[in-house]
Amino acid sequence: MNYFIEGIQGSGKSTLVAKLSKRYPSCTVFREGDYSPVELAWCAYVTKSRYAEILDQYYSIRDLIEENSYAEGDHRVICYTKVITDIPGFHKDLEQYEIYNGRLSFDEFRRIVFHRYENWIGDDMVFECSLFQNIVEDMMLYPNASDSEILGFYRELAVKRKEV
C-alpha cells in the first residue's frame, strides 16, 4: 500500500509522514524536495546539455550536485535544495528549472507529470505533497484551470495509472 499525505502549509503533513515512517519502517519515504518517482517539487528538471553547463558553472560544488542528481532519459533531475552551499544565487538559479510556477507550457507540464506517474511502479511508499498540492496549485495559478479542468486532469491521470 502507498500513502499520499496532502494538505495546506502547517497542517501537519511532515509530522504525519514522520509518524508513518516509524510505524511502517519497511516503507520508502519521499518528502517534499526529495528525489521522487512521481514528484518534482524543489527539483530542477534540465536537459543533459544544461546539466553539463550547471556542473561547469558550479564546479566547486560539482560533487554535491552530482550526489543529488538523477538521470531520467534525456533529462537530469537535480534536488538542488539538498545541496548545502553558501554560493550566492545557486538555489535561485536552479529554481528557474522547476516544472512549477508557470515555467513550462501546460502541455509540457502535463506530459512530464503523466510520464512520471505512468512509469512509476512501486508499493510500500509514503509520499509528502506528491499527488495534489503542487499540481493543483500550479494548475489554479498559471493556466488558471477551472475545477472541472483540474478534475479532468486527474481523471485522465487515473485512467493512465490503471493502464500500467
Regions found by a protein language model. Give the residues of each.
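Extreme N-terminal, non-catalytic leader segments
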Residues: M1-N2
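Hydrophobic anchor at the beta1->P-loop junction of P-loop NTPases
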Residues: I5
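P-loop (Walker A) phosphate-binding loop of NTP-binding proteins
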Residues: I8
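Conserved glycine(s) of the Walker
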Residues: G12
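Hydrophobic positions on the alpha1 helix immediately C-terminal to the Walker A/P-loop
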Residues: L16
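Conserved substrate/cofactor phosphate-moiety recognition/catalytic segment
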Residues: S21-R76, E137-M139
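Conserved P-loop NTPase mechanochemical-coupling segment
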Residues: T81-R103
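ATP-dependent NMP and nucleoside kinases share a basic, alpha-helical "lid"
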Residues: Y100, L104-V164
